Amino acid sequence: MDGSEKTSQDWGHFHRPLFADPKSRDLSRVGVIDVGSNSVRLVVFDGAARSPAYFFNEKVMCALGAGLADTGNLSPEGRIRALAALRRFCTIAKDIGLPDLTAVATAAVREAKDGSDFVGQVLAETGLKIHVIDGSEEARLSAQGVLLGWPGAYGLVCDIGGASMELAEISNGQVGKRMTSQLGPLRLASIKGGKQGRKKVISESLEGLRAQLGQQSDRLFLVGGSWRAIARIDMQRRDYPLHVMHEYRMTPRDIRETSEYIKANNQDHLRKLAGVSSARMDLVPIAIDVLKGILRHFKPHDIAVSSYGIREGLLYEHMPQAMRDRDPLIESCRFAERKDARLPGFGMRLHKFIAPLFPKITVDRERLIHAACLLHDVSWRAHSDFRGEVCFEYATRANLGG
């Protein structure tokens, strides 16, 4: 049952709610570990919902890829931190009662001479099997993560890690061409020749990528911690009032102005204002040089930040196609109504009641009205004097994908 069949209940073109589908209920908590070049993270999704609910989400900055360009090996200190983090994550997963953990490692472990030794050590000490994925697979999973949040997305996905940067084309819900490069800021920090040497490497690498992919005039989707740090600083520079990272939009001009803003300010002061860790802030000046190069070579018309990446792409792998095709906004609002409203199901009746007031609206506008109807009663517990404010906070700051 995928929710598309006819029943006595008319669900409209958004179909039966996913939480009413037995197959969806069978997808219990999903645990994913991402062993990156800069950080190690555990995410536990509370079921493979169309709009993911994060039951647990923790990151440890390990810098496994620090010095990789010079030594060819993983950072010894990074290995110690990563092993400690993985032991802890495995203990947490056991305490939560996860049936299984999916663990992937990316560029640093993939390219290091001692990468396979590290994978073996993790298996011996924790029982966790790490799957080392290649650059093409890394790009595919990141692109799938973007599709989890934007089912109809089109454009170029750019995922930056510590030791690599991946590009993937997306269109009509499908992942197209995929490319990988060595443009991770942790790796670039070790390039000889200082800033000029880095600029030369960045320019030459991007020229090669553009030759393979061609100009990308659609949207550029940014995935990765360094991109999110740049977006946080851009928010701070613009005094942007809504500090929600997912779907935050920027223009090429914004990036240029934020680059100058970073150069003109003390980095320690800036990172505190923007809420960026010191380890991440050290990489931001390099990452923004890469981003400016991407804009020059590919010329996208606008930029959107995606909080969804590899980990969400792995969640996407668990989903049947019928679930992938659903609208994440409507599904998350339906779930919120079922969990928090006094009369679950009334939102759909309310939507039908007011529909004649909007005879000529677009599909995009209709889905927003539908979502508002579903959320109309989820804040009933708030004090009546502040209920309007609480409703606003819920709608603007809740974890509503799409």
Predicted regions and their residues:
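N-terminal glycine-rich anion-binding loops that anchor highly charged ligand groups
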Residues: S51-C62
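Acidic donor-binding segment of Leloir-type glycosyltransferases
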Residues: Q121
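Conserved beta-strand/loop subsegment of P-loop NTPase cores
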Residues: P99-A103
